[in-house]
Amino acid sequence: MTTKILTLGIDNDDIEKLDIGNDKVLLKAKTLGKLESVLEVGEEVDTILVDSHFLASPKEELQIILGLTSLTTKIVLRYYADDELDLDSLRQLGIDLLQAPLTSDGWQALTEGH
């Protein structure tokens, strides 16, 4: 079974660190609008990986993304130690958190079973 991963704001160097296997398809969105359009056309995505620095209002924009995804889609936010985010409220929304820098081990732990 093929797993689809959609990224927003994640550069190629970081994607290479994730060690994404051959059974996965990687889709990259350059803007939040492009990500929204991919989801609006009904593209089934298993995991969405978003960089917190790519969002102007992370909580609000993540809520928009949540509204466009199926219940089985995992949303992962890469955040940084100096971000001023309410991590608990993001967890309550069902957002998984992955602190930068990205590592293959951290990614694998979050995406097991996807």
Specify the residue positions occupied by each region the protein language model found.
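Conserved acidic segment of CheY-like receiver
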Residues: 2-12, 19, 48
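Conserved beta-strand segments of the P-loop GTPase G domain that flank and frequently precede/overlap
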Residues: 7-8, 48-52, 76-79
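Two-component/phosphorelay signaling modules centered on CheY-like receiver
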Residues: 10-32
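Short, structured coil segments at secondary-structure junctions
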Residues: 21-22, 71, 91-94
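Acidic, metal-coordinating helix/loop segments flanking the phosphotransfer/catalytic sites
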Residues: 29-47, 55
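Output/docking surface of receiver
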Residues: 30, 76-114
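Conserved phosphotransfer microenvironments
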Residues: 45-69, 83-86
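His-Asp phosphorelay/catalytic-motif detector in bacterial-type signaling
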Residues: 69-76
